[in-house]
Amino acid sequence: MNELVVATKNKGKLADFQTLFTDRYIVKSLYDYPEVPEIIEDGDTFHENAAKKAETLAAYLQKLVIADDSGLLIDALGGKPGVYSARYAGEPKNDQANIDKVLSELDGVPTQKRTARFFCVIALAEPGKETIFAEGACEGRITEKPTGSNGFGYDPIFFVPSHGQTMAELSAGTKNQLSHRARALTALKETIEGVWPK
């Protein structure tokens, strides 16, 4: 079975990738390759950041690498925090500080104008081959206060109207069906099954 390296040290993300790909690949993460150089995500788009991570690591490791870049796009904030989602409140990255900043900026914005989406771009790179991309989105709105303890990042303030709960209140199984990353992963899996059959 071929190895697939997921370009992350985020255990939540890694679990999402493992769920979908363990039937096809031996899934590894950056924990298995501590020597890899840190890649600065300095792109202006999710596509640029995902490609940079996947292609740089694929060349370095000479292996199949999958990387993603994702973020929260809030309509009332003109699409912010966008590519800066992980570090929206500055360095070091801190989920609670990011949530606090978003809620502060949305103070006084009515519920119907708090629409937002999680957006994810996944890049799959292999040395000598063209990088494959997939996208996924999950629509929702930003709550006025955090609710729920599952998930990570902005999950406690991202309300999913179809389920009447925040991402942080949903079970892992439900989140894996709905999330932007799950949708991008499903799209990627369908693409690679067409390109690289078992």
From Swiss-Prot:
E.C. numbers: 3.6.1.66
GO cellular component, as recorded: cytosol
Cofactor annotation comment: Binds 1 Mg(2+) ion per subunit.
Cofactor(s) listed: Mg(2+)
Gene Ontology annotations of biological process type: nucleotide metabolic process; purine nucleoside triphosphate catabolic process
Stored InterPro entries: dITP/XTP_pyrophosphatase (IPR020922), ITPase-like_fam (IPR029001), RdgB/HAM1 (IPR002637)
Keyword set, alphabetical order: Hydrolase, Magnesium, Metal-binding, Nucleotide metabolism, Nucleotide-binding
CDD domains (UniProt xref): HAM1
Catalysis performed (reactions): XTP + H2O = XMP + diphosphate + H(+); dITP + H2O = dIMP + diphosphate + H(+); ITP + H2O = IMP + diphosphate + H(+)
EC supergroup of this enzyme: hydrolase
Molecular function GO labels: dITP diphosphatase activity; ITP diphosphatase activity; metal ion binding; nucleotide binding; ribonucleoside triphosphate phosphatase activity; XTP diphosphatase activity
Top-level division of the source organism's lineage: Bacteria
Active site: D69
Binding-site residues for Mg(2+), renumbered to this chain: D69
Binding residues annotated for substrate, in chain numbering: T8, K9, N10, K11, G12, K13, S70, F152, G153, Y154, D155, K175, H180, R181
Function according to Swiss-Prot or TrEMBL: Pyrophosphatase that catalyzes the hydrolysis of nucleoside triphosphates to their monophosphate derivatives, with a high preference for the non-canonical purine nucleotides XTP (xanthosine triphosphate), dITP (deoxyinosine triphosphate) and ITP. Seems to function as a house-cleaning enzyme that removes non-canonical purine nucleotides from the nucleotide pool, thus preventing their incorporation into DNA/RNA and avoiding chromosomal lesions.
Assembly: Homodimer.
Family recorded in the similarity comment: Belongs to the HAM1 NTPase family.
UniProt cross-references to PANTHER family, sorted A to Z: INOSINE TRIPHOSPHATE PYROPHOSPHATASE, INOSINE TRIPHOSPHATE PYROPHOSPHATASE/HAM1 PROTEIN
NCBIfam families: PRK14822.1 (NF011397), RdgB/HAM1 family non-canonical purine NTP pyrophosphatase (TIGR00042)
Record's protein name: dITP/XTP pyrophosphatase
Species name: Shouchella clausii (strain KSM-K16)
